[in-house]
Swiss-Prot record:
Name the UniProt record assigns to this protein: Protein translocase subunit SecA
Keywords on record: ATP-binding, Cell membrane, Cytoplasm, Membrane, Nucleotide-binding, Protein transport, Translocase, Translocation, Transport
GO biological process, one term: protein import
Subcellular location: Cell membrane; Cytoplasm
Disulfide cysteine pairs (residue numbers): none
Catalytic activity line of the entry: ATP + H2O + cellular proteinSide 1 = ADP + phosphate + cellular proteinSide 2
Assembly information from the UniProt record: Monomer and homodimer. Part of the essential Sec protein translocation apparatus which comprises SecA, SecYEG and auxiliary proteins SecDF. Other proteins may also be involved.
Gene Ontology molecular function terms on file: ATP binding; protein-exporting ATPase activity
Topology versus the membrane: Peripheral membrane protein
The organism's taxonomic lineage, starting at the top: Bacteria, Thermotogati, Deinococcota, Deinococci, Deinococcales
Length: 868
């Protein structure tokens, strides 16, 4: 095992060394020469011409390009890329996942790969987890790009389609993962070329995904879905929410304990499954006056009752969701603690939760378009990612995305001290210990960040700290608006911050606080001037550098006063002093209140301390009532505590327990990886179908008129062939052909064939019969063109193709949803669910294509152009 680990580390070291020799050293050697370049934009555009017109490969220009980008950073925003950041930039260009510690400047690193790949002129995307980070990244780095002659844009949900088109037409576009995914789906529902927002020629060329583990692993199981309301009664959800209160939760059968399950239903927390017992089924049938709960007409009711029980037993307010001020049930992301407005649980679960909470039930939705992040990002010609924690998930990145992880060396050594876990018997015993440690450390003035796994825990700890008289700030899904402001100051002396999981991720915690953030925020609030205006940025940088020109630069900002400038200078001095004070105290201290299912999430929390060589420390507090320990840890450890007579206030620090935690985490990670991999296998079936439909649709939307005509004629020809295969197959004699059915089907689609002599086809060979019928249909098509004019005919064909494809695809998605929900039952019949799913999905798709071609034929020949 150690040999394997050593090999992994050796490979990483070798790859880093290769980049140092081929990129970093040559770029450094070019630095002085590059500093003498007067016009960086002109020099950079010359490189672009060499790529686009001169045929030079992008890779061959990485050294001069990186040298120019580094110099642009130094001149424009006062930030020169470190050597380690050059390594990160090269890794991102290579399409790898760059693991970079918190505080190593991922935002600046991305500029290297984005600007470099922008030389191809095909569009580059920087994908972030929220609008705030996208806007800040674009505004902070915008000047660097513009110094190189590049354009930069921000695509968010507030923009009109025309504004979004302009944003995506830029060389570099900052956008959130969800907005980008939805824009892709909306583009594939567009009814005109003008409605497309992504580039028509290269919509998905190159992307860097920030916090890549959050998007491609944590959110991999949550598909992006565009829905339309489907007509379905919702009152039953209220009925079943009341009905299940009369049911009794029982225990499952267990060898040696009980042979039959007890109660009306049992639950399985690990898989979030609910199982009705025979007793429960009988009771429900009696309460609802049903003969058979599982008869075809009652299947919906059985499903809704199961979801009502899941909503009651397995989904909890303040942990899995919140109810906002408008009375809407809003999902809380289990990994980040952020609320996810607009996202809804599927299969009626969201409606069941709404009924449980007594709020208005929204109609169930019908899927119009859907894609998972797993398959979406694989559509890019090239994509890369960056995060502080990726190595633990390298196998998944490699297996699913074909991307390996490169651990980038830190610019300065990490000196953070990570203490062993303290394990308590109960949750309250653990909380008491956390409060005690916070009080003790708070008394010294050290800043403390407390990480929690849920909103419920954060509010419980907040209450305990209030009782203990400890002032603190709370950061969770309920307070996202203040997120950046709270995190920016979480490193000041005496500050205590409670953060749900990784709320605030993406914003650095700077020791002593972030004076630049406060000054910028004050200018925006008091003067109404953007902190990213060039004159404001120049003033803030001058304050930070203690530049004598700060006063002169400040007076160029409209509305600013000398008194404001003096206050800004004093704030900077106080921040510098506090930074040193916090360093002397030991830096930021991290308190983890629970081990997460994933080691990666724990590492993210730890990584908030010790940035850029700062001191810091961390410790996790664990109890045997925590979800991870309760569901997955070994009962022997609890027995050991009992035998030792340990009470709630006594912790243990035992390697056996730490080992049990790590094994539990590894088991959960393996299980979750397995689930994501299975999801991908199923989604790959849908993905191939989606790619085929979207490619066909795009050809129709963007193709020239002659291509539309060719596509239409091809579909009509395929329809004719399918009718001949059905009613006049080659393998049977002419006498057995069902000419009446053939005539009926063809005349229904092509009225002009009313006078065609179908009976005469019997005297022909199958090939001749096909030629005669196709020829008659072609004549009808030409007559239709003449009737409408070629231009109107092409407009009709384009309209019909888009409408028919969209309608059939929507219905197909619904059918696939139903198939996916029921396919698990095949496992009970000793059949492989995936094989069955793939087989049936393929048949359904082929049937859809046949039906689609039939409808296109009917509409082309029957629709009046005025109706189009």
């Amino acid at each position: 095992m150690f040999r394997v680990l050593n090999k992994v580390f050796d490979n990483n070291k070798r790859d880093v060394e290769r980049i140092i020799q081929t990129v970093v050293k040559p770029v450094n050697a070019l630095e002085e020469e590059t500093m003498r370049v007067e016009n960086l934009a002109e020099a950079f555009m010359d490189l672009r011409r060499r790529v686009q017109d001169g045929g030079e490969s992008l890779d061959s220009l990485i050294v001069p390009a990186f040298a120019l980008i580094r110099e642009a950073g130094r001149r424009s925003i006062g930030k020169r890329h470190y050597d380690t950041q050059l390594i990160g930039g090269a890794a991102l260009h290579q399409g790898r996942i760059a693991e970079m510690r918190t505080g190593e400047g991922k935002t600046l690193v991305a500029t290297l790969a984005l600007a470099f790949n922008a030389l191809e002129g095909k569009g580059c995307h920087l994908v972030t987890v929220n609008d705030y980070l996208a806007r800040v990244g674009m505004e902070e780095m915008g000047l660097l790009y513009r110094t190189l002659g590049l354009t930069v844009g921000l695509a968010n949900r507030e923009l009109s389609p025309a504004e979004k088109q302009a944003a995506y037409a830029c060389d570099i576009t900052y956008v959130t993962n969800s907005e980008l995914g939805f824009d892709y789906l909306r583009d594939n529902m567009a009814q005109s070329k003008e409605a497309l927002v992504l580039r028509a020629d290269t919509p998905l060329h190159y992307a860097i995904v920030d916090e890549v583990d959050s998007i491609l692993i944590d959110e991999a199981r949550t598909p992006l879905i565009i829905s339309g309301a489907a007509e379905k009664a919702t009152d039953l959800y209220y009925v079943f929410a009341k009905l299940i209160r009369r049911l009794q939760k029982g225990e499952p059968a267990e060898p040696g304990v009980r042979t039959e399950p007890t109660g009306d239903y049992t639950i399985e927390e690990k898989s979030k499954a609910v199982h009705l017992t025979e007793q429960g089924i009988t009771k429900i049938e009696r309460l609802l006056s049903l003969k058979d709960l599982y008869s075809p007409e009652n299947m919906d009711k059985a499903h809704m009752i199961t979801q009502a029980i899941r909503a009651r037993e397995l989904y909890h307010r303040e942990k899995d969701y919140i109810v906002n001020a408008e009375g809407e049930v809003v999902i809380v992301d289990e990994f980040t603690g952020r609320s996810m407005p607009g996202r809804r649980y599927g299969e009626g679960l969201h409606q069941a939760i709404e009924a449980k909470e007594g709020v208005k039930i929204e109609n169930e939705n019908q899927t119009l378009a859907t894609i998972t992040y797993q398959n979406f990002f694989r559509l890019y010609d090239k994509f890369a990612g960056m995060t502080g924690t990726a190595k633990t998930e390298e196998k998944e990145f490699l297996d699913i995305y074909g991307s390996d992880v490169l651990v980038i060396p830190t610019n300065k050594p990490v000196i953070r001290v990570d203490s062993d876990d303290l394990i308590y018997r109960t949750r309250m015993g653990k909380y008491a210990a956390v409060v005690g440690e916070v009080q003790e450390m708070h008394a010294t003035g050290r800043p403390i960040l407390i990480g929690t796994a849920s909103i419920e825990t954060s509010e419980q700890l907040s209450s305990l700290l209030q009782q203990a008289g400890v002032q603190h700030a709370v950061l969770n899904a309920k307070f996202e608006a203040q997120e950046a402001s709270i995190i920016a100051q979480a490193g000041r002396s005496g500050t205590v911050t409670i953060a749900t999981n990784m709320a605030g991720r993406g914003t650095d915690i700077m020791l002593g606080g972030n004076d630049e953030y406060i000054i910028g925020e004050s200018i925006e609030q008091q003067l109404g001037v953007s902190r990213y205006a060039p004159e404001v940025e120049a003033f803030i940088k001058a304050i930070s550098r203690e530049d004598p020109a700060a006063e002169q630069l400040g007076m160029q900002i409209p509305g600013i006063t000398l008194d404001f400038i003096r206050q800004a200078q004093e704030l900077h001095r106080a921040t510098v002093e506090d930074r040193q004070r916090v360093r002397d105290l030991g830096g930021l201290h991290i308190v983890g209140t629970e081990r997460h299912e994933s080691r990666r999430i724990d590492n993210q929390l730890r990584g908030r301390a010790g940035r850029q060589g700062d001191p810091g420390s961390s410790r996790f507090y664990v109890s045997f009532e925590d979800d991870l320990m309760r569901l997955f840890a070994n009962d022997r450890v609890v027995g050991m505590m009992d035998r030792l007579g340990m009470d709630d206030s006594q912790p243990i620090e035992a390697k056996m327990v730490t080992g049990a935690i790590e094994k539990a985490q590894a088991r959960v990670e393996d299980r979750n990886f397995g689930i994501r991999k299975q999801l991908l296998e199923f989604d790959n079936v849908m993905s191939k179908q989606r790619d085929e439909i979207y490619a066909q649709r795009r050809e129709v939307l963007l193709g020239p008129d002659e291509d539309i005509e060719e596509t239409t004629e091809g579909m009509i020809g395929d329809f004719v062939d399918s009718q001949l295969a059905a009613y006049a197959p080659i393998e049977v004699s002419h006498e057995q052909w069902d000419i009446e059915q053939l005539r009926s089907a063809m005349v229904e689609a092509v009225p002009a064939l009313e006078t065609f002599d179908f009976e005469s086809l019997r005297v022909n060979s199958p090939a001749e019969a096909q030629d005669r019928l196709l020829s008659a249909v072609a004549d009808a098509f030409d007559a239709r063109k003449e009737e409408l004019s070629p231009t109107m005919m092409n407009s009709l064909a384009r309209y019909v193709l888009l409408q028919v494809v969209d309608q059939h695809w929507k219905e197909h998605l619904h059918g696939m949803d139903v198939l996916r929900q029921g396919i698990g039952l095949r496992g009970y019949g000793q059949r492989d669910p995936f094989t069955e799913y793939k087989f049936e999905a393929t048949n359904m798709f082929n049937e859809m294509i046949d039906a689609l071609k039939a409808d296109v034929t009917k509409f082309i020949f029957r629709m009046q152009f005025g109706g189009a």
